[in-house]
C-alpha cells in the first residue's frame, strides 16, 4: 500500500502520499488580522496619543498631557449588534492632565473618546450590522532608494530618493553633463553642493574632504558658484533653497533655516517611522558598503593603536565580522562641526573609509556612513543626508548597487492596526488645532480637559475609515475559504498605494522574493491582476511589516539540516542559499546527494550541498491557502490553477456537503481557522448538546456555553448554518470542532460533492465546456443550496399623519391576506410568491390624491372617510420562497430607530435552489462550465456494474488548457471511492504516477483506469473505453435564478422616458446603436420604427398602442420620441429657437412635462430608491469579485 494514514481532527483519517516530514505546523491563518489589531490596542494607540500630545496653547501657559486610556465593555454583544444594525464597538475613555504653567495647577480628568469598533475573534468587524474586513495594504517602504537610468545617448545616470512615512521627499540625480543635483519635495533642482553648504559645510575643500575627490563633485562645485559676495556661502545657499521651495516670497536665511528644519529635522512634521530608520541605517551602514571592497588605508584601533586591517586587504564577510565590534564603535569616526549659519548647528558624526575603485585600481574612493543614528531618531539627520549623497556619488564609481522597487524587501504590509493608527492620528491632528484654539480663547482658571476636547474629528475619522475606505470591505462570505482568503488578502491599491491605471507590468509580475511570502497563483483575473495578492500559507509579518517566511537552518560545520526554524525577510534571504524542501536527506539529517537544487537571489540552480544555508520547511509554503487546496497542482498550468483557486472561493454552501475524496490535507486547517466553525476554547466534557446549544463542563468545574447559528443570512445571501458535531459525554480538547460551519463536513472544508464523472461527448450537449448532468443530482438534492433574502418595511410620520402597519389593506381580497397575522405581518413558515403581501402597510392620502367625490365626502363627514394608500411590502420579482423569520423593531421595545421611523419590520425569505440548466459549475483545476442539460438517470451512460454516471464533461476541455491534474484526480478519486477511503495528496509533495497506478490496482480497477461504458438509452457499449472516475465538483455563486430576467411593462426613466436598465430596476434590454445598424442593413423599417418609438420613449404612442392591443383595434401611428423632445429642450436652453414641423410645415406640439404621466413612470423618489439599491448591489458585487 502506497502512502500512510494521517488523522485530521477527531473525525477524519486520510491516506497521505506526502514524503516530506513536516517540521513546522501551519501558523494560525488569520493571525495577520488578530495580531495586528492586538498590537494596536496594546501599543499602537498609545504611540499615536504620545505623537500628538502634549498640546500647548499659543502663549505656552497651558499644556494638555496624555496619561492613559481604557476600553470599557461594549454596549451590544456580537449577536445584538448584528440584529440591531449597530456596530460592535467599545467605549474608550482617555485620561488627560491639564497643566497651568503659570500657577502650577494640575487638573486630571477622564474624557469619553467615542465608541471604537472592536475586532471579533474571527478577525472581522461588525459595522452597522454588516460584517466587514480591513484588507492589509502592500506599500512601498519608507527608506532610501537608488536607481539608474539610461538617457537617449546611452549614458547611464543615477538617482536617489529618501521616502519618509510622512513628510517631504529628498531626491538626488545626475544630468548628461555629469553634474549632481538635488530636489526638495518635487521642486526645481539645485546643485547638491548647495544643500551641503546649507547644512553648514560651505567651503569647496570641506566638501571634497567629506565626499572625496571625484569628477562629479568637481563639476558640481564649478556649477555652484558664489554669486552674492555680501552673503556667506551658507546664507546664500539657504536663500537659494528658499526660493525653490517658496517662489515669489521674500527670501531670508532665517526663514529658510526654519523651513528646512520643519521639512526634514522636526519629528512632528517628518516621520520615517521605525521601519524607515531601520531601512536607512541598513542601506547606509558602512558594513554592507565595505563588503568585498579592497581597503585603501590601514584600519587602526583608536584606543590601542594596533592595525586591525592592512591596506590592500579585501573586506570579505569574515574580515568584517572580525572587526564588527570596532566598526560599530568609534573606528574611523570623524566629527564635522557645521558653521554658525547652518540649519542644524550640532556636530555631525560620520564614518569614513577609503577603498580602491573597482573600475580604476589607481583611484581611491571615499565611502561615508551615517554612523548608525539611534532607532528612536525618526526624523532625518544631516549625517543621513551626507551618507546618502556619498552612496549616490559612489554609484558613479561602480560602488554600491541600485534598488529593485518590486523586491519584497522594499515593500511592506500595513495591516489593520497600522491603518487604524494612521486614521486615528489624522483625527487627533484635526482635534489638536481645535484644542489649541480653545486653550487660547478661554479663561485658564476654569478650563478642564473635558471643555477643550472635541472628539468629533476623531470619531468622524474612524467612522469614515470603516464606512468608506477602499480597504474596508464587506466580507466575502460565500464560504469559509472565501472568508479566510479575504482576511489574508494583500492589496496594493487604496490610499497611499497604487492606482489601477498607473500600475505597470513590473509591479504586477511575480518576483522571486514572493517565494514563501505571497502566492504567485491566487490573484484576480482582470484589471486587478497582480495588484491584489494573498499571503502564502506560512507567511508572517515582522515588527516592521515585512513578510517573513520560515526555513530550516543548515549546520554548515557538519552539513546537517537541523529542525531549528529561522524566519527570514526577503532582503535577509538574499544573503543566503536556500535548498528545496524535497532535497533528499539521510536519516541523520545530512544531504544524501553532493549537489542539491537551490536558489540564491532568484537564480534556481544546482549548488554543492556544503554551500546551502537553509532548507524550505514545506513544499506548500510557496502558495496561499486556496491554492494549497488544489490536488495535483503541480500538474496544472498556472493560468488554470489561478482560476481554480479563485473559483473555490465562489462555491455556494450546499445542504449536505461532502469533503473531497481526494484532498490535500489543507481542508482541516482551512475550516478550523476560517472562523465559520464553532471551536472548543477549553478542555472539558460535553454535558448538553442539541441543534442550537452545546454546553461543555471544563476541568475546573466551570461551564462553557457554545451557541450554534442556524440559517442566518450571510453577506452574500447564502445560508450560514452550523451543525453540531459532538454528543453528550464526549470529551473535547481545546481547538476541537464543536460544530461544523457552512461548507464543512466532519471538521473539514467541503465546498462541493464527489459525483461520478465521465470524460465523453454526448449528443454535442457538452460543447464549449458545458456540463451534462444526471437528474439524480437534482432529485436527491446533491447540489441544492439555501438562499436567504432580507426585506424590510418601515413606518414613518408623514405630513398627513403616521403610516400604519395593518391587516386592513384597501382594495385587496381576503385570499391575499390569508397568511398575515392580526397586525398585518406575514407568519413564519408561509410560502410566498411574487407579488404577495409580506407586511400590510397604509399611508395617508393627500388632498391632491383625492377625487372630486372623495373631497366632497371629506368636506361633509370630516376626517372619517380620509382615504389611505396601499404601500404594503410585497415579494419582489424572483423572491419566491418560505418565510424563515420576522423581526419587529419598535421604540416601545427600546430599539434604536432612525429619526422619523416608528416601526421597522424585517422579513427573511428562504429559497431552496436545486441545480438547474444555466447554473455554473467547476472543478478545482479551473475547469468551469455551465449546466446545459439535465438527463433522466435511465438515459445516462452506466458502468459495467450498472452504476449510472452523474456528470459528463467534454474531453476537449483538457489538452489545450493543460490542467492534467483533473484527470489524475479523476482516477485517484475512483480508487478512493472503491476502497472507501479519503486521500490527502499535498501540493508539490503528493501522489506520484507510481502511487496513482498502485492505488488504482489496489482498488481492483483496470490497468489504464478506464472502463467500458454503456449507453443508457440503447444498452449498447460505447465504441471506446472512457475515463470515468470521481471528481470534486462545486456549484458556483453564479446561478441562473439571479441572472435570468424578462420585462413586459416596467419603470421608465424620468427625463428620457426610456425603460430603465438592469435586473435590479426591472429594466429592459438595451437596443443599442449597432443593433439599430443591423436592422437598417436589413431594411426592417417597421420593426425599427416600433423599437425606437412604442417600445422605447414615445409616451403617448405606447399608451395608445397598449390600449389598441387590449381592445383589439389596429395600432395607431407612432408619435415623436421623448428623447427628441429632450434634445429640442436642450437646444432651446442654449437660446436656439427650434421647432418641429410636419410634412405640411405645421408645427408639431410636443408633450408638456406633466402630460401623459402614468403609473408606469418611475417617480423621483422611486428612482432614487432603485438607484440606491443598484449602487448597493453593485458595490457588494464589486467587493466580492473585483477585489477577490
From Swiss-Prot:
Protein purpose: DNA-dependent RNA polymerase catalyzes the transcription of DNA into RNA using the four ribonucleoside triphosphates as substrates.
Reactions catalysed according to its record: RNA(n) + a ribonucleoside 5'-triphosphate = RNA(n+1) + diphosphate
Gene3D superfamilies cross-referenced by the UniProt entry: 2.40.50.100, 2.40.50.150, 3.90.1100.10, DNA-directed RNA polymerase, beta subunit, external 1 domain, DNA-directed RNA polymerase, subunit 2, domain 6, RNA polymerase alpha subunit dimerisation domain, RNA polymerase Rpb2, domain 2
Coiled-coil ranges per UniProt: none
Alphabetical list of Pfam families matching this protein: RNA_pol_Rpb2_1, RNA_pol_Rpb2_2, RNA_pol_Rpb2_3, RNA_pol_Rpb2_45, RNA_pol_Rpb2_6, RNA_pol_Rpb2_7
Entry GO terms, CC: DNA-directed RNA polymerase complex
NCBIfam families recorded: PRK00405.1, rpoB
GO terms for MF: DNA binding; DNA-directed RNA polymerase activity; ribonucleoside binding
Name this polypeptide is given: DNA-directed RNA polymerase subunit beta
PANTHER family, per the entry: DNA-DIRECTED RNA POLYMERASE I SUBUNIT 2
Subunit structure: The RNAP catalytic core consists of 2 alpha, 1 beta, 1 beta' and 1 omega subunit. When a sigma factor is associated with the core the holoenzyme is formed, which can initiate transcription.
Keywords, sorted A to Z: DNA-directed RNA polymerase, Nucleotidyltransferase, Transcription, Transferase
GO biological process, one term: DNA-templated transcription
Keyword presence, Nucleotidyltransferase: yes
Cytoplasm in keyword set: no
EC number(s) recorded for this UniProt protein: 2.7.7.6
Family of the protein in this entry: Belongs to the RNA polymerase beta chain family.
Amino acid at each position: 500500500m502506497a502512502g500512510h494514514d494521517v488523522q485530521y481532527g477527531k473525525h477524519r483519517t486520510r491516506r497521505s502520499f506526502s514524503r516530506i516530514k513536516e517540521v513546522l505546523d501551519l501558523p494560525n491563518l488569520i493571525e495577520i488580522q488578530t495580531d495586528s489589531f492586538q498590537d494596536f490596542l496594546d501599543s499602537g494607540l498609545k504611540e499615536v496619543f504620545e505623537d500628538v500630545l502634549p498640546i500647548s496653547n499659543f502663549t505656552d501657559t497651558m499644556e494638555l498631557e496624555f496619561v492613559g486610556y481604557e476600553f470599557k465593555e461594549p454596549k451590544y454583544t456580537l449577536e445584538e449588534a448584528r440584529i440591531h444594525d449597530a456596530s460592535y464597538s467599545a467605549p474608550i475613555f482617555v485620561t488627560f492632565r491639564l497643566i497651568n504653567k503659570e500657577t502650577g495647577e494640575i487638573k486630571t480628568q477622564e474624557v469619553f473618546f467615542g465608541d471604537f469598533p472592536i475586532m471579533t475573534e474571527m478577525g472581522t468587524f461588525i459595522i452597522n450590522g454588516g460584517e466587514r474586513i480591513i484588507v492589509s495594504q502592500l506599500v512601498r517602504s519608507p527608506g532610501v532608494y537608488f536607481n539608474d537610468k539610461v538617457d537617449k545617448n546611452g549614458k547611464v545616470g543615477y538617482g536617489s530618493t529618501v521616502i519618509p512615512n510622512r513628510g517631504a521627499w529628498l531626491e538626488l540625480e545626475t544630468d548628461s553633463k555629469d553634474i549632481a543635483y538635488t530636489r526638495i519635495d518635487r521642486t526645481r533642482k539645485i546643485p547638491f553642493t548647495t544643500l551641503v553648504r546649507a547644512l553648514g559645510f560651505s567651503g569647496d575643500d570641506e566638501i571634497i574632504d567629506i565626499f572625496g575627490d571625484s569628477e562629479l563633485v568637481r563639476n558640481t562645485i564649478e556649477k555652484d558658484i558664489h554669486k552674492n559676495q555680501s552673503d556667506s556661502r551658507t546664507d546664500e545657499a539657504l536663500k537659494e533653497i528658499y526660493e525653490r521651495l517658496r517662489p515669489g516670497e521674500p527670501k531670508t536665511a532665517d526663514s529658510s533655516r526654519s523651513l528646512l528644519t520643519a521639512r526634514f529635522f522636526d519629528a512632528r512634521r517628518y516621520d520615517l517611522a521605525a521601519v524607515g530608520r531601520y531601512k536607512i541605517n541598513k542601506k547606509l551602514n558602512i558594513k554592507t558598503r565595505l563588503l568585498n571592497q579592497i581597503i585603501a588605508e590601514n584600519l587602526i584601533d583608536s584606543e590601542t593603536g594596533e592595525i586591525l586591517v592592512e591596506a590592500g586587504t579585501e573586506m570579505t564577510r569574515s574580515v568584517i565580522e572580525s572587526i564588527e565590534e570596532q566598526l560599530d564603535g568609534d573606528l574611523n569616526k570623524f566629527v564635522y562641526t557645521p558653521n554658525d549659519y547652518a540649519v542644524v548647528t550640532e556636530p555631525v558624526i560620520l564614518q569614513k573609509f577609503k577603498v580602491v575603485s573597482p573600475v580604476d585600481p589607481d583611484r581611491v574612493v571615499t565611502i561615508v556612513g551615517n554612523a548608525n543614528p539611534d532607532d528612536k531618531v525618526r526624523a532625518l539627520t544631516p549625517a543621513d543626508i551626507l551618507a546618502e549623497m556619498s552612496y549616490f556619488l559612489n554609484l558613479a564609481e561602480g560602488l554600491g548597487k541600485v534598488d529593485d522597487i518590486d523586491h519584497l524587501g522594499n515593500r511592506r504590509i500595513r495591516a489593520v492596526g497600522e491603518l487604524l493608527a494612521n486614521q486615528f492620528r489624522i483625527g487627533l491632528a484635526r482635534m489638536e488645532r481645535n484644542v489649541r484654539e480653545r486653550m487660547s480663547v478661554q479663561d485658564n482658571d476654569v478650563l478642564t480637559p473635558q471643555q477643550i476636547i472635541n472628539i468629533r474629528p476623531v470619531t468622524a475619522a474612524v467612522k469614515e475609515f470603516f464606512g468608506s475606505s477602499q480597504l474596508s470591505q464587506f466580507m466575502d462570505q460565500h464560504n469559509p475559504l472565501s472568508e479566510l482568503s479575504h482576511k489574508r488578502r494583500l492589496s496594493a491599491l487604496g490610499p497611499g498605494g497604487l492606482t489601477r491605471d498607473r500600475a505597470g507590468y513590473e509591479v504586477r509580475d511575480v518576483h522571486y522574493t514572493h517565494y514563501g511570502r505571497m502566492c504567485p497563483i491566487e490573484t484576480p483575473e482582470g484589471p486587478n491582476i497582480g495588484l491584489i495578492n494573498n499571503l502564502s500559507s506560512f507567511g508572517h509579518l515582522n515588527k516592521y511589516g515585512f513578510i517573513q517566511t520560515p526555513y530550516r537552518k543548515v549546520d554548515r560545520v557538519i552539513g546537517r539540516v537541523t529542525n531549528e526554524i529561522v524566519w527570514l525577510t526577503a532582503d535577509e534571504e538574499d544573503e543566503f542559499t536556500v535548498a528545496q524542501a524535497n532535497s533528499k536527506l539521510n536519516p541523520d539529517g545530512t544531504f544524501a546527494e553532493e549537489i542539491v537544487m537551490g536558489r540564491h537571489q532568484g537564480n534556481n540552480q544546482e549548488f554543492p550541498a556544503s554551500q546551502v544555508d537553509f532548507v524550505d520547511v514545506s513544499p506548500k509554503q510557496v502558495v496561499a491557502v486556496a491554492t494549497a487546496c488544489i490536488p495535483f497542482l503541480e500538474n496544472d498550468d498556472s493560468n488554470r490553477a489561478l482560476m481554480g483557486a479563485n473559483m473555490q472561493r465562489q462555491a455556494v454552501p450546499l445542504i449536505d456537503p461532502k469533503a473531497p475524496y481526494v484532498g490535500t490535507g489543507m481542508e482541516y486547517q482551512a475550516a478550523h481557522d476560517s472562523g465559520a466553525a464553532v471551536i472548543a476554547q477549553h478542555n472539558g466534557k460535553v454535558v448538553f448538546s442539541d441543534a442550537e446549544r452545546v454546553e461543555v463542563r471544563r476541568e475546573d468545574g466551570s461551564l462553557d456555553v457554545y451557541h450554534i447559528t442556524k440559517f442566518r443570512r450571510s453577506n452574500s445571501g447564502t445560508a450560514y448554518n452550523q451543525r453540531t458535531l459532538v454528543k453528550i459525554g464526549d470529551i473535547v480538547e481545546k481547538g476541537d470542532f464543536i460544530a461544523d460551519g457552512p461548507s464543512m463536513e466532519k471538521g473539514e472544508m467541503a465546498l462541493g460533492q464527489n459525483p461520478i464523472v465521465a470524460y465523453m461527448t454526448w449528443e454535442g450537449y457538452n460543447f464549449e465546456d458545458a456540463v451534462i448532468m444526471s437528474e439524480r443530482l437534482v432529485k436527491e438534492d446533491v447540489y441544492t443550496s439555501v438562499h436567504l433574502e432580507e426585506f424590510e418595511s418601515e413606518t414613518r410620520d408623514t405630513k398627513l399623519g403616521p403610516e400604519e402597519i395593518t391587516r386592513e389593506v384597501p382594495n385587496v381580497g381576503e385570499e391575499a391576506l390569508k397568511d398575515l397575522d392580526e397586525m398585518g405581518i406575514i407568519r413564519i413558515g408561509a410560502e410566498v410568491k411574487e407579488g404577495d403581501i409580506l407586511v400590510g402597510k397604509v399611508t395617508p392620502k393627500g388632498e391632491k390624491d383625492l377625487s372630486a367625490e372623495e373631497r366632497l365626502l371629506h368636506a361633509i363627514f370630516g376626517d372619517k372617510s380620509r382615504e389611505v394608500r396601499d404601500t404594503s411590502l410585497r415579494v419582489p420579482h424572483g423572491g419566491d420562497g418560505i418565510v424563515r423569520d420576522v423581526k419587529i423593531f419598535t421604540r416601545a421595545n427600546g430599539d434604536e430607530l432612525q429619526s422619523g421611523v416608528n416601526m421597522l419590520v424585517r422579513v427573511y425569505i428562504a429559497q431552496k435552489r436545486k441545480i438547474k440548466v444555466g447554473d455554473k459549475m467547476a472543478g478545482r483545476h479551473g475547469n468551469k462550465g455551465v449546466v446545459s442539460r439535465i438527463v433522466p438517470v435511465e438515459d445516462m451512460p452506466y458502468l459495467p456494474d450498472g452504476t449510472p454516471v452523474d456528470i459528463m464533461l467534454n474531453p476537449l476541455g483538457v489538452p489545450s488548457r493543460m490542467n492534467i491534474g483533473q484527470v489524475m484526480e479523476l482516477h485517484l478519486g475512483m480508487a478512493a471511492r472503491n476502497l472507501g477511503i479519503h486521500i490527502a495528496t499535498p501540493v508539490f509533495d503528493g501522489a506520484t504516477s507510481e502511487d496513482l497506478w498502485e492505488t488504482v490496482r489496489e482498488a481492483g480497477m483496470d490497468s489504464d483506469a478506464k472502463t467500458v461504458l454503456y449507453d443508457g438509452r440503447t444498452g449498447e457499449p460505447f465504441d471506446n473505453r472512457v475515463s470515468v472516475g470521481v471528481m470534486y465538483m462545486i456549484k458556483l455563486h453564479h446561478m441562473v435564478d439571479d441572472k435570468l430576467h424578462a420585462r413586459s411593462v416596467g419603470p421608465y426613466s424620468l427625463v428620457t422616458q426610456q425603460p430603465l436598465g438592469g435586473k435590479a430596476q426591472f429594466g429592459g434590454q438595451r437596443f443599442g446603436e449597432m443593433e439599430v445598424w443591423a436592422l437598417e442593413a436589413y431594411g426592417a423599417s417597421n420593426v425599427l420604427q416600433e423599437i425606437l418609438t412604442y417600445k422605447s420613449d414615445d409616451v403617448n404612442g405606447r399608451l395608445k398602442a397598449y390600449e389598441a392591443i387590449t381592445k383589439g383595434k389596429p395600432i395607431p401611428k407612432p408619435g415623436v420620441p421623448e428623447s427628441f423632445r429632450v434634445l429640442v429642450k436642450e437646444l432651446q436652453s442654449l437660446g436656439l429657437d427650434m421647432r418641429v414641423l410636419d410634412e405640411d410645415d405645421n408645427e408639431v406640439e410636443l408633450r408638456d412635462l406633466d402630460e401623459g404621466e402614468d403609473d408606469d413612470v418611475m417617480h423621483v423618489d422611486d428612482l432614487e430608491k432603485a438607484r440606491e439599491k443598484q449602487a448597493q448591489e453593485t458595490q457588494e458585487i464589486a467587493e466580492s469579485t473585483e477585489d477577490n
